[in-house]
């Protein structure tokens, strides 16, 4: 999926759109990338002399990745997905300008409109962040 297809699936726009490309997608698994550049607005304040991507934005990028997976399904194309929670979140590596986040999300449980995914973000094959994310699919 290119950026136009991602924008067709997600309601997010600059500066909050944190998925640049989807590399692979199946019924319950997705791999996407975020190219992190010094031009990201959050680097102005986090931190001016030592730019590091905020962990919460890494988790948001993972949530958006899972959102693309859910919203690309035919039955969900006109719906919104709401981030309902996260558990077991771990940050293992700082993400800095020039890094490419490779993000994966795999659905592990569904019940009605609620879905749970295992998500990971890696840089150069090393784990940067991971967690279990919960979503609610709205109307």
From Swiss-Prot:
GO terms for cellular component: cytoplasm; membrane. Pfam families: FabA. It is found in: Cytoplasm. Its EC number is 4.2.1.59. InterPro entries: FabA_FabZ, FabZ, HotDog_dom_sf. GO terms for biological process: fatty acid biosynthetic process; lipid A biosynthetic process. CDD domains: FabZ. Keywords: Cytoplasm, Lipid A biosynthesis, Lipid biosynthesis, Lipid metabolism, Lyase. GO terms for molecular function: (3R)-hydroxyacyl-[acyl-carrier-protein] dehydratase activity. It catalyses: a (3R)-hydroxyacyl-[ACP] = a (2E)-enoyl-[ACP] + H2O. The active site is at residue 46. Involved in unsaturated fatty acids biosynthesis. Catalyzes the dehydration of short chain beta-hydroxyacyl-ACPs and long chain saturated and unsaturated beta-hydroxyacyl-ACPs. HAMAP family: FabZ (MF_00406). Belongs to the thioester dehydratase family. FabZ subfamily. This is 3-hydroxyacyl-[acyl-carrier-protein] dehydratase FabZ. It comes from Streptococcus pyogenes serotype M3 (strain ATCC BAA-595 / MGAS315). The gene is fabZ.
């Amino acid at each position: 999926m290119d950026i136009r297809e991602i924008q067709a699936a997600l309601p997010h726009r600059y500066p909050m759109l944190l998925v640049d490309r989807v590399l692979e997608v199946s019924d319950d698994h997705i791999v996407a990338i975020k190219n992190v550049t010094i031009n990201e607005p959050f680097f102005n304040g986090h931190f001016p002399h030592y730019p590091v991507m905020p962990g919460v934005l890494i988790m948001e990028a993972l949530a958006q990745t899972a959102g693309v997976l859910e919203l690309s399904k035919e039955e969900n194309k006109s719906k919104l997905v709401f981030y309902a929670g996260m558990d077991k979140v771990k940050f293992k590596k700082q993400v800095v300008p020039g890094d490419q986040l490779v993000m994966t999300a795999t659905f592990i449980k569904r019940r009605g409109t609620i879905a749970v995914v295992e998500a990971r973000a890696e840089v150069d094959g090393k784990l940067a962040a991971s967690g279990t994310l919960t979503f609610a699919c709205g109307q």
